[in-house]
């Protein structure tokens, strides 16, 4: 791939993180679980995140029209202050999550399919371009009777912009540990082919039934990142 395309594909990766990385994953985790909302259930989630010098917010609406199936729609806005003036990212995404095997204890298995579109505006140049992303992910979750949970993800993401395209393999592993009745510790490691992994640790607290607040911090690939989230399931 020519060197002059590297910044474009790097920008695509940032846009992908904002539009879809957490559309189905329960905050504050990036690694997804093999589970869906109950049929007829809905959720609204808002997340503020920081990654290096980029800051942004993501809003997600999810619902389950059928048993074992969840639909997600997301909108994200981000500014990368590594440049002056900042580069702006505006993203929208939609996805499907199907988990045909779901168990309260033991193994559950499923898959997700996400589509995204990111508009990148560089006011310093100025230049504008559109990026398109398609991601597929295999999910496996082990739930223990004591509440400990392990999540495994394996998939691939295809990025296309300015006539160039690239496909990268992705992976992730996450763990949830109950600290109290309504409080969980989360830990995860995730990444993509040809890059070093990212690692994060966080907390999720259920304030009242269906309403959760969360936060996480992490580091990897020579930058730190973090997020704060609020979710309502009903």
Regions found by a protein language model. Give the residues of each.
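N-terminal signal peptide c-region/cleavage motif recognized by signal peptidases
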Residues: 20-22
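Hydrophobic helical h-region of N-terminal Sec-dependent signal peptides
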Residues: 12-18
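Transmembrane beta-barrel domains of Gram-negative outer membranes and organellar outer membranes
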Residues: 24-234
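Bacterial N-terminal signal peptides that target proteins for export
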Residues: 1-12
């Amino acid at each position: 791939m020519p060197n002059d395309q590297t910044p474009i594909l790097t920008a695509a990766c940032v846009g992908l993180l904002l539009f879809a990385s957490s559309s189905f994953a329960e905050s504050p985790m990036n690694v997804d679980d093999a589970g869906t909302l109950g049929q007829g259930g809905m959720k609204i989630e808002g997340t503020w995140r920081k990654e290096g010098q980029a800051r942004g917010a993501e809003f997600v609406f999810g619902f389950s029209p059928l048993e074992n199936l969840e639909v997600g729609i997301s909108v994200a806005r981000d500014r990368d202050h590594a440049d002056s003036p900042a580069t702006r990212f505006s993203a929208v995404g939609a996805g499907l999550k199907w988990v045909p095997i779901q168990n309260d204890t033991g193994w559950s298995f499923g898959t997700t399919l996400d589509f995204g579109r990111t508009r990148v505006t560089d006011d310093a140049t100025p230049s504008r371009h559109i990026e398109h992303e398609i991601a597929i992910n295999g999910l496996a979750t082990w739930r223990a009777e004591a509440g400990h949970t392990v999540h495994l993800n394996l998939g691939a993401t295809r990025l296309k912009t300015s006539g160039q395209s690239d496909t990268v393999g992705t992976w992730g592993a996450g763990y949830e540990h109950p600290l109290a009745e309504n409080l969980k510790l989360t830990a995860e490691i995730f990444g993509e082919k040809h890059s070093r992994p990212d690692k994060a640790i966080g907390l999720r607290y259920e304030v009242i039934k269906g309403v959760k607040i969360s936060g996480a911090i992490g580091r990897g690939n020579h930058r730190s990142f973090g997020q704060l989230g609020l979710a309502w399931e009903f």
